[in-house]
Amino acid sequence: MSDAWLVVGLGNPGAEYERTRHNVGQMVLDELASRTRGSFKRHRTGARTAEVRLGVAPGGAPGPRVVLAAPTSYMNVSGGPVAGLAKYFDVDVEHLVVVHDELDVPFGSVRLKRGGGEGGHNGLRSISKSLGDKDYARVRVGIGRPPGRQDPADFVLKEFSSTEKKDMPFLVMDAADAVEELVIKGFEAAQQKFHAPA
């Protein structure tokens, strides 16, 4: 197995989905690419990828090699491209991080999880099925629950509210920080940092 990490940002293709809640995972990837001056290229596995060094390792050495990947398929069928990327780059599930929107985390919060259920998230369900394994890390970017009786399926495909948009840069930066912490210092250290009370 390679020592590289595969960081996948979930979302839907097309300009009409670009700024929706469901695409927050890809917004985080764009932030990580911006930090590292990475540029995305089309990859034969059905994704846009950028190979970067993320952060600085202890001692000042360049951080770990990371493949940032945004599947170009619709989210609900993202498992095929993710499994293809893991195989192509020879990345074990221990080095796979999926960044996604999370209804069950309040807007503005970031939580980390390894393995377990998908919580009704069809993108995660597709990935788990295609990999035959659920034990990958997830960076759960909180979008909160829809107000009133709004259907969650409609809610995730809408843009953030004007109030939320003001806080989006901070949420995206926090989630990108969580990814960096995870790949440099490990899952437990990142989880402790991002789950600590403010």
From Swiss-Prot:
Query: Do the record's keywords include Lyase?
Result: no
Where does this protein chiefly localize? cytoplasm
An annotated GO BP: rescue of stalled ribosome
User: What residues correspond to the site Discriminates between blocked and unblocked aminoacyl-tRNA?
Assistant: N12
Q: Localized where?
A: Cytoplasm
Entry binding sites for tRNA: Y17, Y74, N76, N122
Question: What's one GO MF term for it?
Answer: peptidyl-tRNA hydrolase activity
Catalyzed reactions per annotation: an N-acyl-L-alpha-aminoacyl-tRNA + H2O = an N-acyl-L-amino acid + a tRNA + H(+)
Q: Which UniProt keywords apply?
A: Cytoplasm, Hydrolase, RNA-binding, tRNA-binding
Q: Which domain of life is it from?
A: Bacteria
Q: Which SUPFAM superfamilies match?
A: Peptidyl-tRNA hydrolase-like (SSF53178)
Q: Does the keyword Endoplasmic reticulum apply?
A: no
EC numbers for this chain: 3.1.1.29
Q: Which GO terms describe its cellular component?
A: cytoplasm
Q: Where is the active site?
A: H22
Positions bearing the site annotation: Stabilizes the basic form of H active site to accept a proton? D101
What function is annotated for this protein?
Answer: Hydrolyzes ribosome-free peptidyl-tRNAs (with 1 or more amino acids incorporated), which drop off the ribosome during protein synthesis, or as a result of ribosome stalling. Catalyzes the release of premature peptidyl moieties from peptidyl-tRNA molecules trapped in stalled 50S ribosomal subunits, and thus maintains levels of free tRNAs and 50S ribosomes.
Family the entry assigns: Belongs to the PTH family.
Task: Cite the HAMAP family for this sequence.
Answer: Pept_tRNA_hydro_bact
**Oligomeric form and interacting partners:** Monomer.
Name of the featured protein? Peptidyl-tRNA hydrolase
Organism name: Kineococcus radiotolerans (strain ATCC BAA-149 / DSM 14245 / SRS30216)
Q: What is the lineage of its organism?
A: Bacteria, Bacillati, Actinomycetota, Actinomycetes, Kineosporiales
> Could you tell me the gene encoding this protein?
pth
